[in-house]
Amino acid sequence: MIIPDINLLLYAVITGFPQHRRAHAWWQDTVNGHTRIGLTYPALFGFLRIATSARVLAAPLPTADAIAYVREWLSQPNVDLLTAGPRHLDIALGLLDKLGTASHLTTDVQLAAYGIEYDAEIHSSDTDFARFADLKWTDPLRE
């Protein structure tokens, strides 16, 4: 199973990002393939928050369009909406404790905890995931 990070979901949808073409192709291949995809609440709500923000994007998506993307992804047969299990909080807090910081890494820690809990691989263009020793992760856009 793979778990995509917010950045890849944004790059796949928002045409203004330089990574859009590669991310869009990767996401289409992944969603239409056989690999299990685990979507998390932090990634989905992060996508909605950023994709609709005029403070972040010159041409933000209308809320209805962003929600439609989320619903479309969740309707795919190889996509699961993951829920935090009984170890999730302990895993996440342990990761934060090892880092010695929360701040801008809090969402990354949440996603890493899902990855560890579900024995899944995080897909992200954010190299901060390399900080988590017990986590499998890759950047599918790396050339």
From Swiss-Prot:
Mg(2+) binds at residues 5, 108. It comes from Mycobacterium tuberculosis (strain ATCC 25618 / H37Rv). One of its GO terms (cellular component) is plasma membrane. NCBIfam families: Mtu_PIN_fam (TIGR00028). It comes from the Bacteria. Its EC number is 3.1.-.-. Its cofactor is Mg(2+). Belongs to the PINc/VapC protein family. GO terms for molecular function: magnesium ion binding; RNA nuclease activity. This is Ribonuclease VapC33.
